[in-house]
Amino acid sequence: MKILKTILLTVFTLCITTACHHDVNEEEKTLAKRTVLIYMCAENNLDQYSFFEDNYRDMITGAQYLSDDQNLIIFADRMSKEEKPYIAKCDKNGIKKVKVYSEDFYCTDKEKMKEVMQWVAKNYPAESYALSLWGH
């Protein structure tokens, strides 16, 4: 009988202390109005002519007009084998890498494209999305 009381008291204590725990579920996350993904396949010989840097400058200039509830996300795969593909966020403060892949891959591979898009949707949820595919 004493063991049963101890078990019941333990279960009761666990229920009371964990019942008030509040997990934030997916619906409670603040949604942006819009998330735009610029998918840049720039792994080509035009990288040497500073097109990439020009594109970056243009995006930074345009980001000055974004509101706080809009996301401009960039996936970039460049010619350099030293610089792995990455995802960056562009806003009024500039461009900041938020994910760098550990290895190079073909950015046109449909499974990799799907992986990138799913990562962006999960990390930058929004009411609506846009995708812009860039290549030279």
Residue ranges of each PLM-predicted region?
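C-terminal motif of bacterial Sec signal peptides marking the signal peptidase cleavage site
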Residues: I16-A19
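Sec-dependent signal peptide recognition
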Residues: K2-T10
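Well-ordered mid-protein domain cores that form the structural environment of catalytic cofactors
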Residues: N123-H136
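N-terminal extension/subdomain marker
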Residues: H21-P125
